[in-house]
Every structure is written in C-alpha cells, then in structure tokens.
C-alpha cells in the first residue's frame, strides 16, 4: 500500500520491503469474501458470486507461495442457491475443530471441507422460521470467536437470531430494530451489536434479553446504517457505515450518541470496514472511490485540524465492495472489486 504519511512501524525492515500484491480473477462478480483463520491454511480465502441467475457459486482459493499465484481448487468450488451476503471460516486458529465455512443468504448454511480437501459438503442448513414458507433474507452474520458454537444472524425481518450450531438450534431470537437489520457483530461471549435501516446502533446482552442500549443514531432520521465493525482489541470502540455516505463513524460505547471521530477522506460511498486484528488503533476502510485506506485513530478525542488523514492508501482498479483483514496473518488485507480478489501486504 502506498504511504500517505508515516507507516504503521516507522522505518522497520518490513516497511522497507516492496509492497506485495497478489491478484485472482474469478469467472464472476465477487460479492462476499473472507480469510481462513486456521494456522495450517495460510493465504486461504473463500469468495462468492453475485449472479442474477440461480444457482450462485462459492470458491475456496489459496496463494501458492512458490509461484505467487492464487489458485482455485475445483474440488472446493460448489453451488450455492442465492448470492451469499457474507461468508466466514470457523474461528479456530489452532485447528481443534472440523474445517467449516459458513454462508448467509436465504438461510444460514454450514459447509464442511473434507480433511483430504477432496470435497465440500453441506453440514447444516439452519432456518429459524420453519413454520413459514417465507423467510426474511439474512443480510449478514458473525461467528463468535470466544464461543465458536455461537453464530448470530441479522435479517430483513427486523430480527437477530443467535444459533447454537452444535445443536443446530436457535438459542435466542430477538426483534432487534424497527426496520431491516443490516449487520451484526459480536463484542464478547454474550454481547453483540447490530445496525439497521432505522438508523441506530444497538447493543444487546444475552443475560438481559428484554433490553438493548442505543449507542448511536443517524443525525438524519431513518438514514440506514449498513455495516458495523467491533474493535476486537479494544471493545470500547466500534465503527459503522451510513448508507451512501463517504464517511465512517467511530463510536465509543461508553459515550453513546456522539462519534469520537469521523473518517472523511473517501471521495465516494464507503462499502466496507475492518479493524486491525492485532492493533487497537488501526482500521481499514474501502469504497466506491476504488480506495482502501488505513487509519491510525490513536489520536481520537484530540482535535485534529481539518480532520484525520489516513496513514496508508491503495487504489484498486474499480469500486471496492469487500474488505477483510487477516486475523492469522495481520500484515495482509484482502479486497474484492468487480471480478478480482487482491491480497495486499500492509
């Protein structure tokens, strides 16, 4: 990534190396994408298609370090009924559990990758509304890193559903908002937050399901909030994206209502945010201006004349729709734009 001021580690040997970029071209437009977490699967990602026809596709790809090519394995490419809105590998760094991949669309699905990598099988298809032929599409989900049997989903039907994937049963279903819920993020074992078309960020504690705390509301009524990122290294902070807005709002849950900082250097709508998995004060944002920007927000709360500037910037070949920061290799960020997946050393 090109430096726009001081790099994250000033003058370190890592920064002296040329930045590395690897590109994979998919046979279709990429929508959802994510990194594998397992230590034994470095540089492995899942990508999913955005096709109008039925079915869609999921591919698992991996960088071959010997020749610098990202390759797709035909055995690990499979059909998916609708375009997945999100995909996540099981948060299992130490490889103690089955190798699972989850996807959300009409239902939450869990896929098992065979130990010999010969195939991917559907393990579970989880439907929280079995009494109805109609189900509100799932807009997003998050896998609980502290308790990997728990996955939380968000839906257009205003609910958030907490699944126990080992029992394949609903733990809790909450009416979370007044309108569609667009994203959900865990902040600990029993705490999650969600954002909605009603313009609010709400925090829920599973020990007290009757109440939620409104952390933030859009300054203009009913302006949807579409994405939410919770800082894993410092859970006091979260970030959200306002629909069709070029700014990212960073919140401190101790001080509801007022953002601690607004990141305003994108030239078009922001589509994705990712907190650094290894640092409490770095966040990456990406959007329709084809830019991925990394910010150091350690000066939060101090007045910065003219607003905060990013410390790193990368310009892609088209609008960036998806962004993920690797938790197992924190010096790598992945972006997706059009039919291309790129992984970037930061």
UniProtKB/Swiss-Prot annotation:
For this protein, the record's SMART domains field holds: WD40
In terms of InterPro entries, this protein maps to: DCAF7-like, WD40/YVTN_repeat-like_dom_sf, WD40_repeat_CS, WD40_repeat_dom_sf, WD40_rpt
Q: Which is a Pfam family this sequence falls into?
A: WD40
List residues, modification N-acetylmethionine. Answer: 1
Query: What biological-process GO terms show up in the record?
Result: anthocyanin-containing compound biosynthetic process; entrainment of circadian clock by photoperiod; photoperiodism, flowering; rhythmic process
Give the matching SUPFAM superfamilies: WD40 repeat-like
Q: Where in the cell is it found?
A: Nucleus
Q: What induces it?
A: Circadian-regulation.
Q: What role is this protein assigned?
A: Clock protein essential for the proper expression phase and period length of both the oscillator and output genes known to participate in photoperiod sensing. Required for the expression of APRR9, APRR7, and APRR5. Regulated by APRR9 and APRR7 at the transcriptional level, indicating the existence of a positive feedback loop within the circadian clock. May function to delay the expression of the morning genes until dawn approaches.
Q: What is the name attached to this protein's record?
A: WD repeat-containing protein LWD1
User: Upper lineage ranks?
Assistant: Eukaryota, Viridiplantae, Streptophyta, Embryophyta, Tracheophyta
Underlying gene: LWD1
